[in-house]
Amino acid sequence: MKILYAVQATGNGHISRAVELLPYLEQYGQVDVFLSGENSHLPTSLPVKYKSRGVSLFYGNRGGLNYFKMWQKFSIKRIWKEAKALPVEDYDIVINDFECITSLACKFKNKPSIQFGHQASFRSNLAPRPQKREFIGEWILKNYATATSYFGLHFNTYDNGIFNPVIKADIIAATPVNKGHVTVYLSHYSKKVITNQLHKVPGIRFEVFTKEVKTETIEKNIRFMPISNAGFTTSMIESAGVITGAGFETPAEALYLGKKLICLPIRGQYEQLCNAAALEQLGVPVVPKMHATFFVDIAKWYDMPAPTPLKLEYSTYQLVQKVIEQAKALMPSTSVGTQNESLNNFAI
């Protein structure tokens, strides 16, 4: 069986999840990966057969999106051409992690697909939302990458078709310890802005992961680290707590480890506002932006008790098994053909 796995690379979380899922997917057949986007800073060992700039989100230095850069990189002509060229018809199963070009290709070629990931959970109105819903944000969540079928992941099973997060095997196998430091990953804030706040709580040690350094450096109570999946995982396992955005993968892993968590959602990104609402229901402090006295919030939060660890109803193996069963139900009785020459339209 041939499987196309389309992965959104607008952030590191999608990449991390794909790396974790790949060995399980490969038990069912040959897996080719379509990597779309250019805002992930993690090196990847994924078997990338097709690669595109996709539609990427870019962040500013003070907690929000960089709309100008996003507009500069956007090309509807390129997206249309790549969707026409992507050979989705050559695969038995198409699994889509919120990737718009694959979704469009499946529409053009009448190919069934399954959306598997966190964004699929927002097909349900029972998934938490902020007090003020945004029409455009809701439309994007439900229409940016449509599929034939949906398999959602979230912090809680809010509805049928929504399941627990995929947690990395290294984290599941780990014994969490508390070595006193706080692990920090805030891709939407600059090193300078983060440093200004963390230096004001000298009694707490921080391990900050940022794209702005290539080697480990220490500045007073802050250890700056280059972005690394293994390094970040180890730091989080050994931390007293985690400060991060209101994405999905990192907060889910921190909650699974029973770590204290404080989240700063990316301004203007509706999905993160939805996640923030869900995290607040779980008792996680959410700070709308890094204000002038954020360091005071950190000091108070650091002394709070750790939460009860998040429980998983299904293992990664079981989740993939369910996804494949759901995807197989979409398969036509006829077999797929051979790959065509449209691969030349994609950069590898």
Model region roles, listed by residue range:
Residues G64-I93, C100-I101:
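Conserved nucleotide-sugar donor-binding subdomain of glycosyltransferases
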Residues H14-E26:
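Short amphipathic alpha-helix
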Residues S124-S190, K211:
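A nucleotide-sugar donor-handling region in carbohydrate enzymes
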Residues P251, L255-A306:
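Catalytic binding pocket for nucleotide-activated donors in carbohydrate/polymer assembly enzymes
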Residues V166-G241, H291:
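Donor-nucleotide binding loops and adjacent catalytic segments primarily
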Residues Q8-N12, Q30-R78:
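Conserved nucleotide-sugar phosphate-binding/catalytic loop shared by glycosyltransferases and other
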Residues V94-C100, A105, Q115, S235-C274:
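A donor-sugar binding/catalytic signature common to diverse glycosyltransferases
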Residues A299-I348:
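C-terminal amphipathic helix plus adjacent low-complexity
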